[in-house]
Regions:
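Conserved alpha/beta-hydrolase "nucleophile elbow" surrounding the catalytic nucleophile
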Residues: 55, 127-132, 224
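The alpha/beta-hydrolase serine catalytic core
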Residues: 31, 133, 138-140, 148-237, ...
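The serine-hydrolase catalytic nucleophile loop
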Residues: 58-70, 85, 233
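Short beta-strand element of the alpha/beta-hydrolase
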Residues: 46-56
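N-terminal cap/lid segment of alpha/beta-hydrolase-fold proteins
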Residues: 18-44
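Catalytic nucleophile-loop/oxyanion-hole region of alpha/beta-hydrolase
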Residues: 61-62, 88-118
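Alpha/beta-hydrolase fold nucleophile elbow
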Residues: 118-129
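Conserved alpha/beta-hydrolase
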Residues: 70-92
Length: 277
């Protein structure tokens, strides 16, 4: 019995020692984030724009292309916050409980946090893959619901995966097959990642372009020419949604992960946010 008590105490101490101090929380709990500031930046006296970076499904703030984009933005004097959505990697929550609406709530919580930073002059949003859907809909919510503590000055979408709605409606998502009208408690993608019934049903009902279209500021959309996961029509439909405010840049030879020409992608993103600062 004494041995069991000691083991329990050690376990609890371990949890306490490695507990994370989350500054922002979403529907599933604390959100792990990384703030990157320009070199030599003094938060007491300086000010700069900031871009919130949103990763794709199953991905992380520390996976390509986010760290390189953050570094390139900093070189141009632009701060960034990249974070793990709820249920992903270092953030709290479960992947199986994740939905796109919950990720929008995460993004809005991060928006509110960025607005509270006194040295931030204006804010941009960037999203990759599912994060692109989240970023576009978040921008629309900000525009339509009056979240205007700081100006939203630009939106960058990297291979925005609006095809997820079609996939869930067709009952075929990545390598998972299911009845779209009555999906199981969860499906397993790539033999590891669980997506829950709530995700599979709610994604079918998203008004992606209708929500996104409320934002009328500048938009840059970047899509890899060799993207085999998200078809080009997704980006083309976003261009139709935003009209003349949007431009689509196709990076020839680039894949969906943006891992072959990451520097070029980071430079295109940075040039966009620097131009509109």
């Amino acid at each position: 019995m004494k041995r069991i008590v000691i083991l329990l105490i050690v376990a609890l101490l371990g949890q306490w020692m490695y507990a994370k101090d989350y500054q922002v929380s979403g529907p599933q709990g604390g959100l792990a984030m990384t703030l990157t500031l320009p070199d030599g930046f003094d938060i007491a006296t300086d000010s700069c724009p900031l871009v919130i970076l949103m990763h794709g499904i199953f991905s992380s703030k520390n996976f390509t292309p986010m760290p390189k984009i953050a570094k390139q933005l900093a070189k141009a004097g632009i701060a960034s916050i990249r974070f793990d959505f709820g249920g992903h990697w270092s953030s709290e929550g479960e992947m199986q409980l994740m939905t796109i609406e919950k990720e929008i709530a995460d993004a809005l919580a991060m928006w509110d946090y960025a607005c509270s930073l006194p040295y931030v002059s204006k804010i941009g949003l960037l999203g990759h893959s599912q994060g692109g859907v989240v970023a576009s809909m978040t921008a629309g919510r900000i525009a339509s619901q009056g979240h205007t503590a700081k100006p939203l000055y630009g939106l960058a979408l990297l291979a925005p995966a609006s095809v997820l709605k079609n996939a869930c409606r067709n009952g075929s998502l990545f390598d998972a097959k299911f009845d779209p009208a009555d999906p199981p408690e969860y499906v397993r993608c790539f033999k590891m990642m669980k997506l829950g019934r709530e995700y599979l049903l709610s994604t079918q009902q998203l008004d992606i372009y209708g929500t996104a279209g409320a934002y009328q500021g500048p938009v840059r959309i970047i899509h890899g020419g060799n993207d085999r996961l998200v078809p080009m029509w997704c980006s083309e439909d976003f261009v139709k949604t935003y009209g003349e405010a949007a431009e689509l840049i196709v990076v020839e030879g680039e894949n969906h992960r943006l891992s072959k020409k990451t520097r070029k992608v980071a430079e295109l993103v940075t040039a966009f946010f620097d131009t509109h600062r």
